[in-house]
Amino acid sequence: MQYLSVAEVAKKWNVSERSVRNYCAQGRVPEAFLKGKIWYIPENAEKPERSNKKEQPVTLLDVLQDEKANRYAGGIYHKTQIELTYNSNHMEGSRLTHDQTRYIFETNTIGIEKEVLNVDDVIETANHFRCIDSIIDCAKTTLTEKFIKELHLILKNGTSDSRKEWFAVGNYKKLPNEVGGMETALPEEVAGEMKKLLAAYNSKEEKSLEDILDFHVKFERIHPFQDGNGRVGRLILFKECLKYHIVPFIIEDDLKLFYYRGLKEWNNEKGYLTDTCLTAQDRYCLLYTSPSPRDGATS
């Protein structure tokens, strides 16, 4: 049998000499052997096929995790942080503008001279960024009471609420509350209701958009925390959509009233909330998925 050198094979295969050595060292060239520091390669050896480590399609979650890890500016992760934080906080009364929210995310500073800002708005904005990081990191994990409480703890940490004796940061409410004029679960009922809700939800191996929305409606009706339920609920929505390869969405200001109507009318007409969220999904696809620097990403 005739043998060729690494240089000869590299020229024949149109690859670098380093690639040829790697193929040989990995055992991918039959009957090639090393003598001293020299590889002897059969003259009839064929070039190994390139292995493709990323056979699975790149998902939105992959992109978010990659851009988060690499602190990529201007991509899907960057825009999701700003849009989800601004809109979700704005729904709950935050007076920070979109530009102020963006400035805090991008610079971790506040560039305001004459305007008076609510300190809690600033703290909760910074905390919400961390919440989004958490749902991206933990997107594939099973939804649990512990994780939900951790989201609330992150969101409310360092706020004026956290200094109130009756306000349980990272734990279920101590006092009765309401949402939209509707009664919610009493404090003594919350733990049991949350366990039942999660058990029923997690009993299904795969979740549809309707399953995730149904959980969201029931979560908001329990209203387990003293405050912050809407934001925690919408963070859970986003996480679960990522987990089950459903396009996530952000409820913007012009969809807010339709969203609230959908929550209220869910038992009678699921279409109100579903259609609102489908509209929000279309916007997310249009604004984020298409312009992403990572072509080929799927939900």
What is the meaning of each model-derived region?
Residues 2-13, 17-22, 26-29, 34-290:
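FIC/Doc superfamily catalytic core
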Residues 288-299:
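Single conserved hydrophobic/aromatic residue that forms the stacking wall/gate
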